[in-house]
């Protein structure tokens, strides 16, 4: 049985493994293709991946072997994502991406960390253009990001944003995702994602985050 104890991990159970396609690009961008330690080790022993980089200070042990936790792995066979239906889920995270952390009424942009779980409580709200009390639906064409001030002023009135919202395509969402921060577990990942996040100030390395 594999040992993933705190002594081996320096209290770091959250470290992820970046999964690359055979062409050395991430398998997906939304979300970024990362694996848990269990998934990466399982794929390794199934001979589906090769290890590109490791966490030198994180060791996983079993009675017969010891192995460093992979930081970056690559598929041995190319996975053609065009064979899959590229679905865009309607959820809070994707609304944040589509609207670029920007109030769609006053245009105020928030620079807060997109990974902050309280962002929709402290800074922005998801507003229904046509309020639900007046029959408005919860879908891509009726919800936008709003700052709290605009949301309070709007109340249950029907006020239209500067640009009417629409459902983004998968590739439109990827283009917008490039303009928002991305959190990574290891700076060795930068080499493989920098073609997507060309502004390196948007790349946040977990152990260096302040």
For each of these PLM feature ranges, what is it?
Residues 51-107, 179-184:
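Short, charged surface segments at domain edges that flank catalytic/cofactor-binding sites
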Residues 137, 141-210:
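A detector for short metal-coordination/catalytic motifs
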Residues 1-44:
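General detector of N-terminal leader/presequence modules that precede the first folded domain
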Residues 115-130, 157-165:
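Short cysteine/histidine-rich zinc-coordinating motifs and their immediately flanking basic loops
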Residues 120, 130-143:
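Short linker/helix segments within small regulatory modules
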Residues 87-124, 144-148:
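Short cysteine-rich loop/turn motifs with clustered Cys
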Residues 32-63:
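N-terminal juxtadomain amphipathic helix
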